[in-house]
């Protein structure tokens, strides 16, 4: 089956920035790369990105093909270019389907979120339980009601009819049927058409759809959701002496001691566990010869540091970082902590 990634929207919720599917997330991936990375591609034979011709000024189609091939184990990746904006996501999908004479199953994946899921070639909808999430724009989603056999009885757009919302993954076993239903609902003339409307029309016509629960959902579809995700991730430049251990020096007996500041160590360990994309960089005046000892010491407290920068001057430090609409002001912050105090958590 084919995996379709429709990315031809206006990105109107992200003014003054690149198209949202090309925004860089904290882990260094483009949003479209991150979106694809959670999908089990066992049943996928081809990936199709449906993008606007005008977006070529931001990225070359060849680069998109190569980047998606790398994270899909070499699957065939094709680009379908649109010369004009479409009226809806179904219209974007239909523009590609119209150019294929044969009938085939396909799976639509939104490009502005992440979830873990394995598409199958049947009619299906991926969903998430509302109770599994801390932050979600509940009113912007579509929802499903299901029976005890996990069959969908009703799907509704922007109406909370259950605790199961559609997370942006839709399977169709027939491209021809999708187009027939699309045309019956007004096709290109319908400016308020959603994929959920296609599915609901098919349900009314007696066609079955199954529901499958997805996992580990992350939403970047709105500016608020995107910024909330970005803000959860930090590059933490942390002094060693006086913060994570009681301050020591080469003149101590013995030199460079490792008396733990347990409260601060516990806080940093918990922070990194809760924010797995964050990175800890240790900054210290200790010599390079102590680097291995610092790493081993931190591992005792379940802290894995990204880097240890040694031999710094025993003097003030200044952090300089740029800011932009995709990484807004203030993009850097500083904490001045009383030496050997154990209340680092209060400043975060």
Residues covered by each model-derived region:
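Short beta-strand-to-loop acidic/aromatic patch adjacent to the donor-nucleotide binding site
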Residues: 103-114
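Conserved N-terminal catalytic core of the sugar/cofactor nucleotidyltransferase
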Residues: 2-5, 13, 24, 29-105
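Conserved alpha/beta core of the MobA/IspD/sugar-nucleotide pyrophosphorylase nucleotidyltransferase superfamily
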Residues: 165-233
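N-terminal nucleotide-binding beta1-loop-alpha1 segment
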Residues: 1-17, 231, 235-241
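Conserved core of the sugar-phosphate nucleotidyltransferase
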Residues: 114-189
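HAD-like aspartate-dependent phosphatase fold
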Residues: 233-348
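Short, surface-exposed amphipathic charged segments that create phosphate/polyanion-binding patches used
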Residues: 91-99, 140-145, 224-229, 317-328
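Short, charged/polar "capping" segments at the starts of alpha-helices
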Residues: 54-62, 135-136, 288-294
């Amino acid at each position: 089956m084919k995996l379709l990634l429709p990315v031809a929207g206006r990105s109107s919720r992200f003014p003054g920035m690149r198209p949202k599917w090309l925004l860089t997330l904290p882990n260094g991936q483009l949003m479209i790369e991150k979106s694809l990375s959670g999908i089990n591609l066992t049943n996928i034979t081809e990936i199709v990105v449906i993008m606007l011709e005008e977006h070529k000024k931001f990225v070359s189609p060849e680069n998109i093909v190569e980047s998606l091939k790398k994270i899909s184990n070499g699957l065939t990746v094709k680009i379908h270019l649109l010369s004009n904006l479409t009226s809806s996501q179904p219209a974007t999908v239909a523009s590609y389907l119209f150019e294929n004479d044969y009938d085939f199953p396909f799976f639509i994946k939104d490009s502005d979120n992440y979830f873990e899921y394995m598409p199958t070639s049947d009619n299906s909808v991926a969903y998430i339980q509302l109770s599994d999430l801390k932050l979600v724009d509940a009113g912007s989603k579509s929802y499903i009601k299901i029976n005890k056999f996990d069959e969908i009885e009703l799907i509704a757009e922007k109406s909370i009819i259950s605790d199961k919302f559609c997370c942006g993954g839709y399977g169709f076993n027939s491209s021809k049927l999708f187009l027939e239903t699309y045309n019956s609902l007004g096709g290109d003339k319908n400016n308020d058409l959603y994929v959920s409307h296609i599915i609901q029309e098919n349900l009314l016509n007696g066609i079955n759809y199954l529901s499958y629960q997805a996992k580990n959902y992350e939403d970047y579809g709105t500016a608020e959701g995107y910024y909330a995700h970005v803000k959860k991730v930090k590059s933490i430049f942390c002094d060693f002496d006086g913060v994570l251990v009681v301050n020591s020096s080469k003149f101590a007996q013995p030199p460079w001691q490792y008396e733990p500041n347990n409260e601060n160590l516990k806080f940093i360990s918990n922070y990194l566990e809760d924010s797995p994309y964050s990175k800890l960089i240790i900054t210290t005046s200790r010599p390079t010869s102590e680097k291995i000892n610092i790493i081993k010491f931190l591992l005792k407290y379940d802290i894995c540091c990204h880097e240890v920068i040694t031999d710094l001057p025993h003097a003030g430090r200044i952090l300089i970082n740029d800011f932009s609409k995709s990484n807004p002001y203030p993009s850097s912050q500083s904490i001045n902590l009383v030496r050997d105090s154990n209340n680092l958590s209060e400043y975060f």
